[in-house]
């Protein structure tokens, strides 16, 4: 009988880890997110958060109360580099600082982003001072 010793190879550091908190009712956010990061070396993990009907400020704030638990379940006991809370209206209703605090309880080392805060940062970076919106 022949045997060959194979020494294991360890990866010292993985790609940046991004966790997404997706609304239970949002069927597209993962696909959209993957399209944004597809050519980048990013490891992407998702968990869903329960949403409540009707969509009221009170229900959006109620939903935000679950952010810490939902965040904990994204790679439990592992660090993430960034956590994205994928609910624009929920961020505005509860406040970005509140969402950030709730995420940091579960993943203290993670940066926190939301669609609304990312848009504001992009507008500032591009030095855009005025935005016009046309809706029906």
Kindly give the residue locations of the regions a language model identified.
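An alpha-beta-alpha
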Residues: 128-136
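Phosphate/pyrophosphate-binding loops at sites that engage ATP/ADP/AMP, CoA/4′-phosphopantetheine
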Residues: 70-80, 122, 127
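Short, acidic/small-residue loops that bind anionic groups at enzyme active sites
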Residues: 100-123
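Nucleotide donor/acceptor-binding cores
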Residues: 16-18, 126-129
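Short acidic, glycine-rich surface-loop motifs adjacent to enzyme active sites
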Residues: 74-92
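N-terminal glycine-rich anion-binding loop in soluble enzyme alpha/beta folds
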Residues: 1-69, 136
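Short histidine/acidic/glycine/proline-rich micro-motifs that form metal-
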Residues: 51, 88-91, 119
